[in-house]
């Protein structure tokens, strides 16, 4: 199975969940928040198609501490591929955070069962914050799942 990604930032983020994290930006977004910091990830056609098996292998080799945040774009647009990727990363013992602009209720239970952190809610420019950890606006919720 393939997945469409925008980019990967290896082992350098302190703002996308606890610890130093790698961030996988998935391609495609149905929310398109005003003030989005990653508009290049909006159009699904602009992404790079990769095999999930190849991607998981690359992440396993390059992510030093096994901490990854899956962001976007909007990861839930590729729900089936996202589930498969999370399953593979779980086998490799990754600490997984998922960032979605959707509500918690829209995140499939099979995903919630396999991640450690979840950030929900779309970015609202008027509620932008730099003091609430791991979120961009005050309406967003960051929670530890397990």
What are these regions (language model features)?
Residues 1-25, 34, 38-44:
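N-terminal [4Fe-4S]-dependent radical SAM core
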Residues 41, 73, 122-123:
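Flexible loop residues that form catalytic
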Residues 43-56, 76-112, 117:
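Canonical radical SAM enzyme core domain
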Residues 56-76:
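Short Fe-S-cluster ligation motifs
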Residues 76-87, 128-146:
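P-loop/Walker A phosphate-binding loop and immediately adjacent motor/lid segment at beta-alpha junctions
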Residues 116-124:
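Non-cysteine beta-strand/loop elements that form the S-adenosyl-L-methionine
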């Amino acid at each position: 199975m393939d997945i469409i990604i925008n980019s990967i930032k290896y082992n350098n983020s302190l703002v996308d969940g606890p610890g130093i994290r790698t961030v996988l930006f998935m391609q495609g977004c149905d929310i398109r928040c005003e003030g989005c910091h990653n508009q290049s990830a909006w159009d699904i056609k602009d992404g790079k198609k990769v095999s999930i098996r190849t991607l998981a292998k690359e992440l396993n080799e390059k992510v030093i501490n096994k901490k990854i945040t899956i962001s976007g774009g909007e990861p839930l647009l590729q729900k089936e591929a996202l589930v498969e990727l999370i399953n593979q990363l779980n086998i490799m013992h990754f600490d997984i955070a998922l960032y979605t602009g959707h509500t918690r209720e829209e995140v499939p239970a099979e995903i919630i069962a396999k991640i450690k952190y979840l950030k929900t809610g779309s970015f609202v420019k008027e509620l932008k914050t730099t003091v609430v950890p791991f979120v961009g606006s005050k309406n967003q919720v960051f929670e530890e799942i397990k």
